């Protein structure tokens, strides 16, 4: 990583408060070039606390943009960080509406020339898309990274009509803990306590809402832009990663938005900005977005719109591993999407009917739903999962050409089941001559009728000669998929079943990117001790109770531990998620998350702690949720609340 210290403009920054129409003020940090000439503004609008949680990331990029002639602005969302108001539902209308108000406010500043761009990662990129759909006049361009256009089936809540257990639970539990964090008295003064209590009294676990909407209803339709791409008037640069669950958003946006104001990039990365991308190779993401901003906000000829509509990373075959520093492969470009370079090729399944009755712990080697460069975030060798699945192999001839795919594979499966409900999960794997099985992509569908047709997530991969293309079909996938009641597997008939692969013809491509660079880091320090290595909890640990037939997955999200900030803050985060299931009981799954967050300013003194617990279980008719929040200041418990709720299983 190149650290840049010299820029075309000298810069400065200040913290400001942005008023909204309802009287709420939002906390913001503005980096500006030192010039008397008004410049375009760039907005990153996020709930993730600009004075601590995203501060290291913010300092890597906002001063960089300011040094290139932009007012780069980071705003805490309503009810988060040092902003006023109550934390809200990310899929409600308030968040993009607030974003539109902020855009209008920025456009009216004397240092802004009236043109605004908006950028975001994950939820923040999704909010940028939704804000663009409101079409605020000053908003001319958007960069959405690892974001979703479809919060129902293209996010962390449902997959193929089934509850995404690890996504639903982990996100709801994390957001409950994060929403309970207080404002910082260094920035809001003595008002922090009253602001915090008001915030806490207004909290409600989001799992209540998400489990109450188990089908694609109006709640989910309003929460994304997929229902009306035409509402977006700004130019959109959509960016995704092969190991991020939101990568298909890029494919849909480049297909449905006008070609003169959309471009897409899908790299090898997980859920993070591509200049920090793991697996690599990382790219010069800041330079690439600068080309986007300069073209759409300054009218400069950067050549960005002469790039292919979609630039994609196609991975070369590689051994399975839970973490990769860098993957082999190459960049390709397609001028339209769907691309004439991609031809659907059908592979018919062969053999007699096969009974598929996977044990409920099938899926423990799925990897994280949303990996972000963790040591153990990616799927390891799939041989154990394949052993619990019906596998259909298609050899690539040793003396033939490689099979290169780009796009979304599709499966058609003829299934019979005596159970009233169930799921089918399909995985596409690259099997090496030594038997190692590397996961390429996957998908799932709730059972209904006899023929089941569904797409897998988008992939870019090369199967080399001598390898096998494997379709693995299972009836369980915990903890990704929450089992349906009475799920008992199915019979798969290869007659009438097929795998359709999007085969891309090999072209001479010249897609290149600059090497990554950033501005100077903030200087956050992480204290270490000699016994850190011995006491650090594994990121992913699988525990089997042989006598009880019970399996437990324990995960520890990163980062964890204590971080010291230059402004004197000490922030400590510790969390543990557990996913438990009995191998033969579809009603046995349960999830549990515990968080402890401590914010400490020794010089004030200020010392607050947030402890949360979130759990989900089920019976045949209901989901059973339990959540608890305890907040202390010093030794005083300021807030303690428990929520218990039964939610009918209407579809999940």
Task: List PLM regions with ranges.
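N-terminal cap/lid segment of alpha/beta-hydrolase-fold proteins
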Residues: 2-35, 399
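Cap/lid segment of the alpha/beta-hydrolase catalytic domain
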Residues: 34-107, 156-158, 386, 420-422, ...
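Accessory cap/linker subdomain of secreted extracellular hydrolases
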Residues: 58-59, 67, 133-231
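Alpha/beta-hydrolase fold nucleophile elbow
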Residues: 110-122
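Glycine-rich nucleophile elbow surrounding the catalytic serine of serine-hydrolase chemistry
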Residues: 120-130
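Short beta-strand/loop motif that positions the catalytic acidic residue
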Residues: 232, 238-240
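Active-site-adjacent alpha-helix of alpha/beta-hydrolase-fold enzymes
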Residues: 248-262
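C-terminal, loop-rich substrate-recognition/catalytic regions characterized by aromatic stacking residues
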Residues: 265, 273-274, 279-632, 636-652
